[in-house]
Amino acid sequence: MVKILLENEPYLVARIDNQSLNPYMFGERYGFGIEAQNEQNSKIKKVIEHYEKKVASGKVPIRESKSLFIKDTKETPDSLKFLQYLYDKGNEENLKLYIAVNLKQNKDVFYQAVMSNKKKLVKKILSYNPKCIDYTNSEGHNVLHIALKNKAKADAEMIEILLQCKPKLITEKNKENLTPLMFGEKYGFSEVLSKKEIDKIKAILKDYERDAIRYDSYLPDPPNEKMVDFEDELLGNNLGGVNGTEL
């Protein structure tokens, strides 16, 4: 019966109930079929795990029961819950598959992990797919802009994790031409964090911004274009050869 259900609706393995349990977690907690024999329970587990791998590999898309960019931060989308479940279960193969395949197709899952302040999960994601740190959305926000949104739970430690991974996040601008610090100052940082935590975040952002400015000041000046053109002319580079002769 379990196999029949999952053949018709494979994504059900990732569906989360009101107790924040997916089918496998529910079975583990409540003993699967109490009337079923151990051998039968073992078969059920294998069937569920088979379909979990299908979801993790991207062969079966997760149908969200909630909007991914949630307005109420108490709600978490099913795709992120499933990712957290794979992490908690310690299934490295499925976790790696899910991160490699699904996060390329659905960047919002990574953003939501950051906004939900899932630090261990974010570190794991970045260890398997470092390119996630370079993601930007349609508004030009990088992951640091997103971490500072007014509903985000990302604390100072999460901000530090992101900046340690890619310090240049601090100077990248969105389509409003705002760096993350400017974005936070304009829109008020997160309203779900304490003032003390926001002050910590501001201090970290300012430190990284100061370091970025200091680093830029030590870089050599760009070459003078006119001087480069003059040198090229002397060397015959503008003609594609040596001493003005074509090759």
UniProtKB/Swiss-Prot annotation:
InterPro entries: Ankyrin_rpt, Ankyrin_rpt-contain_sf. Pfam families: Ank_2 (PF12796). It comes from the Bacteria. Keywords: ANK repeat, Repeat. ANK repeats lie at residues 105-135, 139-171. This is Putative ankyrin repeat protein RBE_1110.
